C-alpha cells in the first residue's frame, strides 16, 4: 500500500501529533508499506532537504519570514498543490491520502485527494477552538478566528455554520473555529479521532462523514525495557515530570501555582518549549520552586527522565483529546495526574490521580494527599505496568491498515 501523510504539525515541532506520525510511519514501513510525509517546516538548506527525502520526508513550500508563534506556516494551498503536482507526480498512484491537521499543507492534501480520486482519511487531533482561545490575546480572538475561517473557506466549502451556544462554542471565536473544524472533516472520506469523547463532540457540531476512533500508539523500537514498579518512600522527594508544550492551553502557570501550595518535598522537571516557557521559568525561580526547565530535548532524554520519575502530569482542561503524555507514562509504568475527566478514557482505572477540578488549590490538595499516602505510587505504577503492552503501536497498527483497506474498497 502507498500512503501519503500531510501535516502542518510535524517538522520542527514536538508533541503528540509528531509522536503519532513517527510511530505510525515506522510501523507501516515495517510491514512493507510505502509511506511519504509532506509537512510545513522552517527554512532548510538543499542538502538537508535531500537527506530528508531519503526517508521519504518532504518539506512543502513554507513561509520564510512568517511564523505562527514557534510553528512554521505553509504557503497558500494552491501553491503547495502545484508544487506537489510538479515534484511528486507519483502521488496520483497512491492508495490513501492521510491528513493530520487543518492548515495549508493539510488542505492541499485533501484537495489533491479529491482531484486524483484517491480516498482521504482525516485525523482530527485537537480542539482548535481552545488552542486559538489560549494562544491569541483577548480582544483579537474573534478577528483571528474569523480570518482563519474565511481563509479556510476559500479552499474547502463551508456548508455547516456552527452558531454560538452554551456548550463548547460559547463565544463567536470558538463558533468560528468549530465551523472550520467541522467543514474540514466533512471534506474527507473518513474521519479518525484519538478518543470517543472527541468523536461525540464532532458529531454534535455537524460532522456527517463516518468517524472512527483510533488511539495513538507508542513506537515499539523505543518501548521501555523491563520497567519496575515505582516507589516513593515516606518523607522522600516526589519526582514530578512534565513533557509536553509549555503553553497557556496546557496550563503550566496554574500548575506552578498549585506547586506553591504543596506541603512536602518535590522536584519538578519540565521538558518541552512553548509560549509560556520563559514566563514559567522566571516565575518558578522568583518563587523558589524546585523546578527545572530543560527545554526541547531528544526523546531519548525524555524517556530516561520519565523512567526516574514518580508522577507524570497533564493538567490541561477541556482541551486535550488524547494526551500522548499519558501513553508515554503508561509505557514506562509511571502514574499520571490530570484534571480533565475526559482523560479517564485514555489510561487504565487505578493508574491515575484526578483533581476534583482545574483550580490550583484543588490540584495542590490532590498532590498533598499523595505525599501523605506515598504507598499509592506503587499501587498505581503496578496498574500501569499490567496494561502497558496495550499501547504498543504494533498492537494497534493492524486496525489502521484495516481502516485504509476498507476505504480503498469503497
Q: What do these predicted regions represent?
A:
Residues 279-300:
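Nucleotide-activated donor-binding/catalytic signature segment of Leloir-type glycosyltransferases, i.e.
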Residues 374-408:
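A charged, aromatic-enriched C-terminal amphipathic alpha-helix characteristic of glycosyltransferases
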Residues 149-226, 235:
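Donor nucleotide-sugar binding/catalytic pocket of nucleotide-sugar-dependent glycosyltransferases
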Residues 326, 331, 335-338:
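Short hydrophobic beta-strand element within catalytic cores of glycosyltransferases
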Residues 1-53, 58-59, 260, 398-401:
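N-terminal subdomain of nucleotide-sugar transferases
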Residues 351-361, 369-374:
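Conserved acidic donor-binding segment of nucleotide-sugar-dependent glycosyltransferases
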Residues 192, 231-260, 269:
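Conserved donor-binding/catalytic core segment of Leloir-type glycosyltransferases
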Residues 95, 189, 307-321:
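Acidic donor-binding loop of glycosyltransferase active sites
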Amino acid at each position: 500500500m502507498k500512503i501519503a501523510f500531510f501535516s502542518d504539525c510535524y517538522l520542527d515541532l514536538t508533541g503528540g501529533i509528531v509522536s503519532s506520525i513517527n510511530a505510525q510511519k515506522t510501523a507501516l514501513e515495517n510491514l512493507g508499506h510505502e509511506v511519504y510525509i509532506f509537512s510545513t517546516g522552517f527554512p532548510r538548506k538543499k542538502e538537508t532537504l535531500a537527506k530528508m527525502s531519503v526517508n521519504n520526508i518532504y518539506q512543502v513550500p513554507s513561509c520564510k519570514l512568517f511564523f505562527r508563534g514557534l510553528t512554521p506556516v505553509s504557503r497558500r494551498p494552491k501553491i503547495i498543490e502545484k508544487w506537489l503536482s510538479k515534484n511528486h507526480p507519483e502521488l496520483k498512484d497512491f492508495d490513501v491520502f492521510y491528513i493530520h491537521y487543518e492548515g495549508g499543507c493539510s488542505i492541499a492534501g485533501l484537495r489533491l485527494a479529491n482531484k486524483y480520486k484517491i480516498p482521504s482519511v482525516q485525523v482530527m487531533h485537537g480542539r482548535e477552538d481552545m488552542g486559538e482561545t489560549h494562544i491569541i490575546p483577548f480582544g483579537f480572538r474573534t478577528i483571528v478566528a474569523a480570518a482563519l475561517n474565511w481563509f479556510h473557506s476559500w479552499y474547502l466549502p463551508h456548508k455547516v455554520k456552527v452558531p454560538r451556544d452554551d456548550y463548547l462554542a460559547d463565544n463567536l471565536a470558538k463558533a468560528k473555529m468549530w465551523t472550520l473544524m467541522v467543514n474540514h472533516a466533512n471534506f474527507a472520506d473518513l474521519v479518525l479521532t484519538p478518543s470517543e469523547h472527541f468523536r461525540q463532540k464532532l458529531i454534535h457540531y455537524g460532522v456527517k462523514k463516518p468517524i472512527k476512533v483510533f488511539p495513538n500508539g507508542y513506537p515499539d523500537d523505543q518501548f521501555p525495557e523491563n520497567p519496575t514498579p515505582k516507589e516513593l518512600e515516606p518523607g522522600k522527594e516526589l519526582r514530578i515530570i512534565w513533557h509536553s508544550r509549555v503553553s497557556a492551553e496546557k496550563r503550566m502557570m496554574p500548575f506552578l501555582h498549585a506547586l506553591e501550595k504543596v506541603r512536602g518535598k518535590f522536584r519538578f522537571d519540565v521538558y518541552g518549549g512553548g509560549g509560556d516557557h520563559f514566563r514559567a521559568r522566571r516565575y518558578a525561580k522568583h518563587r523558589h520552586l524546585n523546578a527545572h526547565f530543560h527545554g526541547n530535548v531528544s526523546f531519548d532524554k525524555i524517556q530516561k527522565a520519565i523512567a526516574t520519575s514518580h508522577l507524570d502530569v497533564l493538567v490541561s482542561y477541556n482541551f486535550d483529546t488524547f494526551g500522548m503524555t499519558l501513553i508515554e507514562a503508561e509505557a514506562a509504568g509511571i502514574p499520571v495526574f490530570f484534571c480533565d475527566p475526559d482523560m479517564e478514557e485514555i489510561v487504565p482505572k487505578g493508574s491515575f490521580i484526578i483533581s476534583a477540578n482545574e483550580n490550583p488549590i484543588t490540584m495542590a490538595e490532590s498532590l498533598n494527599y499523595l505525599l501523605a499516602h506515598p504507598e499509592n505510587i506503587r499501587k498505581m505504577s503496578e496498574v500501569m505496568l499490567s496494561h502497558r503492552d496495550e499501547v504498543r503501536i504494533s498492537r494497534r497498527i493492524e486496525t489502521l491498515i484495516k481502516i485504509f483497506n476498507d476505504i480503498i474498497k469503497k
